């Protein structure tokens, strides 16, 4: 089980990303717009750099919803491989069966 503070830190990052998503998209659109003037693009780049670091979605880490484990997480389920295996063996994940051929 991961430390509670790490799980809470990731939750705080997710909240920050949601909060600034629209503003980041707007600034990135200006920066990537070929028709925008150089001054507008520079101003947008400055504003983007002034946003909090944790507002960037790249800084998020996928964590297991049950244990908080940062590695081995299946993004389709949001659960770490070890917990996913336990749930599958108990039949608690619908539509997943053990492979046999």
Swiss-Prot record:
Spell out the SUPFAM superfamilies in the cross-references: Glucocorticoid receptor-like (DNA-binding domain) (SSF57716)
Q: Does the keyword Amino-acid biosynthesis apply?
A: no
One Pfam family linked to the record: Ribosomal_S14
Q: Which UniProt keywords apply?
A: Ribonucleoprotein, Ribosomal protein, RNA-binding, rRNA-binding
Give GO cellular component annotations, separated by semicolons: cytoplasm; small ribosomal subunit
Q: Where is this region: Disordered?
A: 36-61
Indicate whether Lyase appears among the record's keywords: no
Name the Gene Ontology molecular function terms of this record: rRNA binding; structural constituent of ribosome
Could you tell me which Gene3D superfamilies the record lists for this protein? 1.10.287.1480
Q: Which InterPro entries match?
A: Ribosomal_uS14, Ribosomal_uS14_bac/plastid
GO terms (BP aspect): translation
List all membrane-crossing ranges: none
Stretches with biased composition (Polar residues): 47-59
Q: Which domain of life is it from?
A: Bacteria
* Known function: Binds 16S rRNA, required for the assembly of 30S particles and may also be responsible for determining the conformation of the 16S rRNA at the A site.
**PANTHER family (alphabetical):** 30S RIBOSOMAL PROTEIN S14, SMALL RIBOSOMAL SUBUNIT PROTEIN US14M
Q: Which family does it belong to?
A: Belongs to the universal ribosomal protein uS14 family.
Q: How does it assemble?
A: Part of the 30S ribosomal subunit. Contacts proteins S3 and S10.
Q: Report what the protein is called.
A: Small ribosomal subunit protein uS14
Q: Record the organism.
A: Methylobacillus flagellatus (strain ATCC 51484 / DSM 6875 / VKM B-1610 / KT)
């Amino acid at each position: 089980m991961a430390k509670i503070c790490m799980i809470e830190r990731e939750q705080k990052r997710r909240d920050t990303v949601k909060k600034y998503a629209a503003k980041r998209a707007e600034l990135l659109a200006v920066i990537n717009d070929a028709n925008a003037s150089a001054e507008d693009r520079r101003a947008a780049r400055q504003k983007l750099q002034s946003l909090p670091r944790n507002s960037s979605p790249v800084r998020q880490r996928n964590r297991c919803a049950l244990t908080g484990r940062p590695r081995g997480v299946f993004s389709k389920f949001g659960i770490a491989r070890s917990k996913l295996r336990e749930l599958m063996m108990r039949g608690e994940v619908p539509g997943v069966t053990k492979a046999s051929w």
